[in-house]
From Swiss-Prot:
It is found in: Cytoplasm. The keyword rRNA processing applies. One of its GO terms (molecular function) is RNA binding. One of its GO terms (cellular component) is cytosol. S-adenosyl-L-methionine binds at N28, L30, G55, E77, D103, N123. The gene is rsmA. Gene3D superfamilies: Ribosomal RNA adenine dimethylase-like, domain 2, Vaccinia Virus protein VP39. Belongs to the class I-like SAM-binding methyltransferase superfamily. rRNA adenine N(6)-methyltransferase family. RsmA subfamily. Pfam families: RrnaAD (PF00398). Specifically dimethylates two adjacent adenosines (A1518 and A1519) in the loop of a conserved hairpin near the 3'-end of 16S rRNA in the 30S particle. May play a critical role in biogenesis of 30S subunits. It catalyses: adenosine(1518)/adenosine(1519) in 16S rRNA + 4 S-adenosyl-L-methionine = N(6)-dimethyladenosine(1518)/N(6)-dimethyladenosine(1519) in 16S rRNA + 4 S-adenosyl-L-homocysteine + 4 H(+). This is Ribosomal RNA small subunit methyltransferase A. Keywords: Cytoplasm, Methyltransferase, RNA-binding, rRNA processing, S-adenosyl-L-methionine, Transferase. SMART domains: rADc.
Length: 275
């Protein structure tokens, strides 16, 4: 990659700017530029596309996205120590990298989105990754402002994202992702690819928005999944008691003796629509 974009190796960048990944910020820097290119390629063609990135750190993934031809990258970085390293990348790619210093959880990405196609590609900080994904899945207007999400998570979170019914990993996150997206795990990334190495394997997940998801009120779906999976080993007649229990299930045509992990996304939407 250094040969491709003419920028110095990431290890040199980190040493020169005194960057150490901080646990409090959920940081693990991905330094293998072959891997950052693999992540960026998972998002598909990037020409004429604006890419949002969260937590770019020293900019390894940022460089890969730009080298693969993205029209522009808008990167949200909370750690001010990383800004000088990102400024060097911005100088190398004039007009194509905008860095916003701030908290991604408080950032209105839709308001920042320009006209034209938008993709989100990120090695998400572990401590905010799941909440960011949920935020991107919950807008009332659908299809959303983004064309795809290509995101790195701890593998256990990735398994929850893609899980369907009768899977041990199936839960509220799997229902939400299955309702509004077609999600797949693309590839795993071993701990030694990062600095410092996390204790767990990571995985890259690629999500595409469903054009016509089942009509369902988000707030009701949240209530139903929270109650059902909050007591996942109990029969639904018991776990859904606060929401109507057996009468709700009968109205939706669902056997009250079933358990949460056996319900499809469509059946959860049916329950939500009968609340």
């Amino acid at each position: 990659m250094a040969a491709l974009d003419g920028l110095p190796p990431l290890r040199d960048v980190i040493q020169r700017h005194g960057l150490d990944a901080r646990k409090a910020l959920g940081q693990n820097f991905l330094l293998d530029l072959n891997l950052t290119q693999k992540v960026a390629r998972t998002a598909g063609a990037l020409e004429e596309t604006t890419v949002f990135e969260v937590g770019p750190g020293p900019g390894g993934l940022t460089r890969a996205i730009l080298a693969l031809g993205a029209k522009k990258v808008i990167a949200v970085e909370r750690d001010a120590r990383c800004l000088p390293a990102l400024a060097e990348i911005a100088d190398h790619y004039p007009g194509r990298l905008e860095v916003i210093e701030g908290d991604a959880l408080k950032t209105d990405f839709e308001a920042l989105a320009p006209e034209g196609p938008v993709k989100i590609i990120a090695n998400l900080p572990y401590n905010v990754g799941t909440q960011l994904l949920v935020n991107w899945l919950l807008p009332k207007a659908w299809p959303p402002f983004w064309q795809s999400l290509t995101l790195m998570f701890q593998k256990e979170v990735g398994e929850r994202i893609v899980a369907g019914e009768d899977d041990d990993h199936y839960g509220r996150l799997g229902v939400l992702c299955g309702w509004r997206t077609d999600a797949r795990m693309a590839f795993d990334v071993p701990p030694q690819a990062f600095t410092p190495p996390p204790k767990v394997t990571s995985t890259v997940v690629h999500l595409l928005p469903r054009e016509n998801p089942v009509q369902c009120a988000v707030a009701n779906l949240e209530k139903v999944t929270q109650a059902a999976f909050g007591q996942r080993r109990k029969m639904l007649r018991q776990s859904l008691k606060p929401l109507g229990g057996e009468s709700l299930l009968v109205k939706a045509g669902i056997d009250p003796a079933r358990r949460a992990e056996t319900l499809s996304v469509e059946e959860f939407c049916l329950l939500a629509n009968n609340l």
